[in-house]
């Protein structure tokens, strides 16, 4: 059911583009940090409130324009319990703005993370089928290929006649999971679509041109996640521009 909801949001917004929230404090506007430091002092609360303000502002920019938001859990949980509170609040705010919320945590056991209220959770496929145990109204997205620098050391090892990550993708897709494939290469996208022709793909950091093999003739089948939008000076204008740029490659009908 949860995947159906995501696909409905994509069709309603006419774009397969999601906002990614994975903020690094040293990349936020100095003005935002200064405002909260002046208010609370140089304490954890100032930093977490800056993250809350930053995230809320971006959700406002995405509302009505984008179908979904991807929230990187570690960006908030690194700030402790107050960061966890911000993460939960942002998921609630995303729902209020009719954005499908994906919690990116790569969980081996999704159960503890479902309490945050996200519609979907990314899971670690190396835990086996246990990582896919979610209620019918939630979605497990298996992170078969990750974007961290050393990920390829394991994920590209050969498993039979193909890379390990492709073998995992096939197994996860057979069990009904969506797949997260962090790549900027069209060859990777083409390979996973060949192995998993019906799987829904989340493509972090991939542009429209390289993501093209993921989509069918109706612009269905995948969601791109853009983390550059979170650092723009004018998020609303940046979202509008990103949607227009993607439409040159993918048209949703």
What are these regions (language model features)?
Residues 1-86, 93-96, 240, 244, ...:
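Conserved N-terminal beta1-alpha1 strand-loop-helix module at the mouth
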Residues 24-25, 29, 36-37, 42, ...:
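Conserved anion-binding
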Residues 184-224:
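A C-terminal functional module that forms or caps the active site or interfaces directly
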